[in-house]
């Protein structure tokens, strides 16, 4: 061997081929360039580099885990008990300071990103919907008559997730993976349907005062927890191949309108965007009034479609066509 090629990626945050590798649909990813350098080396150098204790990190430096273990056995003195002596990255009080917020935001972006990459997840089907919608067998426990009437959407969510996961399995479970908020109600139904089909699914949980253990149907290795709503919503969309919105409350509408706004303003490609339950959504939101008032354009009403059943949603997604991105905003 006379030479080997080492490829190095330079980007602000993400690998150079991230958008192509996932079929990314968002405008969040920075531009990146791939630089290839050919380095002349001898055979012994190659062997030494690639056999260093089977170390995949490719460097000879002492790792953080070793130091964490080492400091556990230091003598117990006034100095070693002092907060100043703690390793910065293991010091919870330090990590929770206001000044460390940028670091915490970055960590919440990186951890799920790296773990989803490791699992080979390329694209997702996003399910938004209410946590209070019960399954039909338990609709008698619903807080209101309307929630009981909406319980059939639990079954539609479950069936849609089952059908989509059967399709996902054709790609080895890498494409069209169901992702929910990981909680009860519609979210539970989505993860449950994926499990019905023998596939895996993602849960993006958020720490709330009144909730929530993840529902029992999320794939454990793909069950994440967030402090920041903004980063959680970003992860919902970074691999989104389609977005399905079921009846829900403020949280569902927050997720729905942020996603629609990104598409409307050309910050995200126009992916299939389906609202389950036309009667519910037309009662809750007067879409035509927004267009009549001129606060949105008539063309904005074409960014989404109403559906009632799982099969109808599958058919629309299959026939949606190639995602496009707006280069201007109608009405501006």
Predicted regions and their residues:
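Short, low-complexity, charge-dense intrinsically disordered segments
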Residues: 19-20, 37-40
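Phosphate/pyrophosphate-binding betaalpha-module
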Residues: 178-180, 184-246, 250-253, 257
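Short, acidic/small-residue loops that bind anionic groups at enzyme active sites
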Residues: 198-211, 246, 260-287, 298-299
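Compositionally biased, intrinsically disordered low-complexity segments enriched in Pro/Arg/Gln/His
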Residues: 2, 21-22
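C-terminal functional extensions of proteins
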Residues: 275-332
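Short hydrophobic targeting helices and cationic amphipathic motifs
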Residues: 15-18, 29
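Glycine-rich beta-alpha loop segments
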Residues: 61-75, 79-204
């Amino acid at each position: 061997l006379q030479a080997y090629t080492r490829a190095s990626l330079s980007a602000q945050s993400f690998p150079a081929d991230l958008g192509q590798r996932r079929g990314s649909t968002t405008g969040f990813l920075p531009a990146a360039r791939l630089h290839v350098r050919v380095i002349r080396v001898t055979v012994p150098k190659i062997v030494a580099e690639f056999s260093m204790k089977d170390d995949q990190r490719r460097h000879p430096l002492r790792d953080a885990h070793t130091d964490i273990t080492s400091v556990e056995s230091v003598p117990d003195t006034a100095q070693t008990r002092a907060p100043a002596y703690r390793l910065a990255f293991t010091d919870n009080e330090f990590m929770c300071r206001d000044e460390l917020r940028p670091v915490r935001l970055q960590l919440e972006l990186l951890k799920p990103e790296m773990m989803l990459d490791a699992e080979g997840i390329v694209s997702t089907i996003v399910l938004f919907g209410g946590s209070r919608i019960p399954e039909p067998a338990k609709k008698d426990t619903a807080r209101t008559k309307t929630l009981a009437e909406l319980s059939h959407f639990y079954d539609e969510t479950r069936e849609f997730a089952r059908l989509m996961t059967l399709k996902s399995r054709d790609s080895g479970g890498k494409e069209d993976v169901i992702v929910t908020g990981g909680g009860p109600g519609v979210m539970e139904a989505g993860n449950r349907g994926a499990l019905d089909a023998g596939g895996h699914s993602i849960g993006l949980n958020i720490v709330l005062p009144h909730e929530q253990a993840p529902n029992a149907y999320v794939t454990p290795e793909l069950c994440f927890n967030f402090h920041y709503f903004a980063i959680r919503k970003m992860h919902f969309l970074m691999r989104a191949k389609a977005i399905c919105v079921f009846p829900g409350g403020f949280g569902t509408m927050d997720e729905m309108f942020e996603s629609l706004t990104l598409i409307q303003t050309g910050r995200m490609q126009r992916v299939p965007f389906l609202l389950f339950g036309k009667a519910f959504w037309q009662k809750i939101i007067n879409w035509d009034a927004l267009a009549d008032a001129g606060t949105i354009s008539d063309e904005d009403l074409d960014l989404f479609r109403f559906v009632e059943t799982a099969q109808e949603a599958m058919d629309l997604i299959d026939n949606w066509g190639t995602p496009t991105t707006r280069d201007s905003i109608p009405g501006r």
